[in-house]
Amino acid sequence: MSKYIAGPEIERLIQILARLPGLGPRSARRAALHLIKKKETLLEPLGAAVQAAIEKVGICSVCGNVDTIDPCSICTDSRRDDTTIIVVEDIADLWALERAKTLAARYHVLGGRLSPLDGIGPDELNIATLIQRVVQNPITEIILAVNATVEGQTTAHYITDQLSNFPVKITRLAHGVPVGGELDYLDDGTLAAAVQARTNL
């Protein structure tokens, strides 16, 4: 009896797809079969897009966003407010706020949130680089757009404490962000209201 149902290459494709968020083994099998059936219109363009991403996409050295240029297109956009930095946990949160089109400011991606139980401390996050940006630039406001989770709020308080000696206003998102909620799952209107109703810490 064969080790593989449909060949090792297909099994490998299924295993890789199953690692994606929201895809379990069954969904990965369905996705793999769909890609194979649509080889010319889906599988080949997907392969080309993945290869292009491998070759051209990188992390912005200023804010931590992903882009094909460094600094990224947000950091090089002269129409944005240079005095305000929106701090987010992950790139998905940055994208969610950009979709809401509420504030043309700069961003800073932490790369996660403080979680001692998971071994994630300040040194594992981009907090030192945030402080460096505040020191080197005329920043007047830091908006802490972290998720309304225990870890997110712990991260917000830690950053507030680290910036307490700087002449910078620190605010956070308010109305519309439910406790325990994550930014990437909120609709654009809710996010817009949250940004406009931000409060002091």
UniProtKB/Swiss-Prot annotation:
Keywords: DNA damage, DNA recombination, DNA repair, Metal-binding, Zinc, Zinc-finger. CDD domains: TOPRIM_recR. The keyword Secreted does not apply. It comes from the Bacteria. A zinc finger (C4-type) spans 60-75. GO terms for biological process: DNA recombination; DNA repair. It holds the Pfam family RecR_ZnF. GO terms for molecular function: DNA binding; zinc ion binding. Residues 83-178 form the Toprim domain. May play a role in DNA repair. It seems to be involved in an RecBC-independent recombinational process of DNA repair. It may act with RecF and RecO. Belongs to the RecR family. HAMAP family: RecR. NCBIfam families: recR. This is Recombination protein RecR. It comes from Bartonella tribocorum (strain CIP 105476 / IBS 506). The gene is recR.
